[in-house]
Amino acid sequence: MKIVKISPRGYCYGVVDAMVIARNAALDKSLPRPIYILGMIVHNKHVTDAFEEDGIITLDGPSRLEILDKIDSGTVIFTAHGVSPEVKQRAKEKGLTTIDATCPDVTKTHDLIEAKKAEGYHVIYIGKKNHPEPEGAVGIAPDIVHLIEKADDLKTLEIPTDKILVTNQTTMSQWDVQHLMEDIQKKFPTAEFHKEICLATQVRQEAVAKQADVADLTIVVGDPKSNNSNRLAQVSQEIAGTTAYRVADVSEIQLEWLQGVENVAVTAGASTPTPITKEVIAFLDQYDPMNPATWDRIRKVPLQKILPRVKVKKEQ
């Protein structure tokens, strides 16, 4: 079996920065304990499990405000997905120490929404409902930001002004966003468009679109909650025309997927630890359908290998 290692794949700078911020927090003895992450720091359970070993508690729930209600003291880390001003204010009122690990690309969208609100605009925001990134973006100005996920959402959308900005969640499929923007332009011809697919998401999607078409199968390594990982599988199927499966790690690979497959493409979401992806590639590389000894799919990567290394500051 030939392995097509799609490149680029895996970690983006926003994810690495967020994890380094959280690791440094764990090492900072001056920070009030306990230390919480408000939601998953990035959408990967291997990462959150590794942070648990570092002594950082991940709390998840329907909304950031609801999670915050569970915390009475200590330090709170805001995830790469960003949070609303209301969440920041609530944390301040509760006397919590806060650390902001928001991805710079997400912050740029928040700043854009604030600027356009000041100019009297309404904002149509394309994103996934119940995902933390749209929650934070809508929370910047909930009175003028309208979240839509699909074309059907446009049917009932009414906006009381011609001053309309259209932007989007950074991890969406760029093709889905383009199609929705075309639909929006038909209904709201005066709308201004500001596509905010982050560069890391864009180049990873384009790599799948261009490189997966030579494969019989694509394996996307990523957490089920990772929107960008799920979009990579979608791009493989809809753009490259190659059947795709998303797996959290090697243990989720089904042998029947590999029957008759000569070329398998492998990519990974922006929040997927590199050792987890390497383990998937190593399994596929040694897999022999005629040799049961090669069929074991057991994740062996230790949690201490998941997180990026940080330099420990020497005490003066």
UniProtKB/Swiss-Prot annotation:
The protein's annotated pathway: Isoprenoid biosynthesis; dimethylallyl diphosphate biosynthesis; dimethylallyl diphosphate from (2E)-4-hydroxy-3-methylbutenyl diphosphate: step 1/1; Isoprenoid biosynthesis; isopentenyl diphosphate biosynthesis via DXP pathway; isopentenyl diphosphate from 1-deoxy-D-xylulose 5-phosphate: step 6/6
InterPro entries the UniProt entry points to: LytB/IspH
Enzyme Commission identifier(s): 1.17.7.4
Cofactor remark: Binds 1 [4Fe-4S] cluster per subunit.
Enzyme class: oxidoreductase
Sequence positions that bind isopentenyl diphosphate: 43, 81, 131, 226, 228, 271
A Pfam family assignment: LYTB
Domain of life, per lineage: Bacteria
Function summary: Catalyzes the conversion of 1-hydroxy-2-methyl-2-(E)-butenyl 4-diphosphate (HMBPP) into a mixture of isopentenyl diphosphate (IPP) and dimethylallyl diphosphate (DMAPP). Acts in the terminal step of the DOXP/MEP pathway for isoprenoid precursor biosynthesis.
The protein's name: 4-hydroxy-3-methylbut-2-enyl diphosphate reductase
Species assigned in the record: Bacillus mycoides (strain KBAB4) (Bacillus weihenstephanensis)
